[in-house]
């Protein structure tokens, strides 16, 4: 199935609540979703490196 049809399918209310899952609204990725930010890890990293997420910066120790 195409990614857009899978995004539409994920938005529908599932028959059982355990079947519900999150997708990244930017790229549609179903895995590695960060609930706190509502995006996937790859989009999170790209946005953090560009400085688009306030209060987030690359760690260094």
From Swiss-Prot:
Q: Name one GO biological process term.
A: translation
Matching InterPro entries, A to Z? Ribosomal_uS14, Ribosomal_uS14_bact, Ribosomal_uS14_CS, Ribosomal_uS14_sf
| Cofactor binding annotation | Binds 1 zinc ion per subunit.
A single GO CC term for this protein reads: cytoplasm
Q: What UniProt keywords are attached to this protein's entry?
A: Metal-binding, Ribonucleoprotein, Ribosomal protein, RNA-binding, rRNA-binding, Zinc
Give one Pfam family.
Ribosomal_S14
Can you tell me which residues bind Zn(2+)?
Answer: 24, 27, 40, 43
Q: Which cofactor does it need?
A: Zn(2+)
Which SUPFAM superfamilies does the UniProt entry name for this protein? Glucocorticoid receptor-like (DNA-binding domain)
Q: Could you tell me one molecular function GO term of this UniProt entry?
A: structural constituent of ribosome
Instruction: State the similarity comment.
Output: Belongs to the universal ribosomal protein uS14 family. Zinc-binding uS14 subfamily.
Instruction: State how it assembles.
Output: Part of the 30S ribosomal subunit. Contacts proteins S3 and S10.
| Reported function | Binds 16S rRNA, required for the assembly of 30S particles and may also be responsible for determining the conformation of the 16S rRNA at the A site.
Protein name per UniProt? Small ribosomal subunit protein uS14
Annotated gene:
rpsZ
